[in-house]
Swiss-Prot record:
Transmembrane segments: none annotated. The lineage of its organism: Viruses, Riboviria, Orthornavirae, Kitrinoviricota, Alsuviricetes. Capsid protein self-assembles to form filamentous capsids, about 1400-2200 nm in length. It is found in: Virion. Belongs to the closteroviridae capsid protein family. One of its GO terms (cellular component) is helical viral capsid. InterPro entries: Closter_coat. It comes from Grapevine leafroll-associated virus 3 (isolate United States/NY1) (GLRaV-3). Its main location: virion. It holds the Pfam family Closter_coat. This is Capsid protein.
Amino acid sequence: MAFELKLGQIYEVVPENNLRVRVGDAAQGKFSKASFLKYVKDGTQAELTGIAVVPEKYVFATAALATAAQEPPRQPPAQVAEPQETDIGVVPESETLTPNKLVFEKDPDKFLKTMGKGIALDLAGVTHKPKVINEPGKVSVEVAMKINAALMELCKKVMGADDAATKTEFFLYVMQIACTFFTSSSTEFKEFDYIETDDGKKIYAVWVYDCIKQAAASTGYENPVRQYLAYFTPTFITATLNGKLVMNEKVMAQHGVPPKFFPYTIDCVRPTYDLFNNDAILAWNLARQQAFRNKTVTADNTLHNVFQLLQKK
């Protein structure tokens, strides 16, 4: 009994005297004989008669290939005048794929063995959703609680009270310090780096920053001040929009930030799609880039690439 090619099917000749044929209905893999692809994909029924029939015993469906013997290495195909076709065929050891369609594998062992381009692990039966506890860019909740306790002690010491109204005012002063002096880990404070309360008390930036750093000591955070204050992002934005916080316009100008984007470009705020629109996100990114560029130029004037000359013009 002979096997005949059909339109709409995908075939591949496997080198075994060009008699063994692989059959599928998808577009993955490579064809060893370009004429098969041409005639079956783009040809007519009449053109199929130009391809010799193959004995049925040498035809293998895609599913059977997984258990078939290992195929010998293919010989380099002879050069042909016609343009090379796009790689289309079938994926061994997997279900047949159709163009632009994923195959979902329920067995994780099979998925890990295959790791195919068009294969996804089937998660339909999983009801648990991973919960992110500690977000990147922030200190952990546990460390934040330690810092909160330390700042409460500082509040009582500096403000002379720790009632709710006093705590609220104190944290407004803490945020104002961040807006005025920013939160770079390399900042060195001077004796006049402080802000005054309504009743004339002085709150020094170094007090606040050292309090946070000491509470987060030995936790491994690169910049605990910035990563702690990131929790105050919504408060920073709303307080700035409502005129409760005053920006350091000199630094904002150095970073190239227009006034309407001041609330979104304080260096300790963390972008969130709940509070940032696309323009605010762009402004935040551009401010970061400019700040990094300024820091790099200040730290090292060595010319590493001629394109750096363009940035200096």
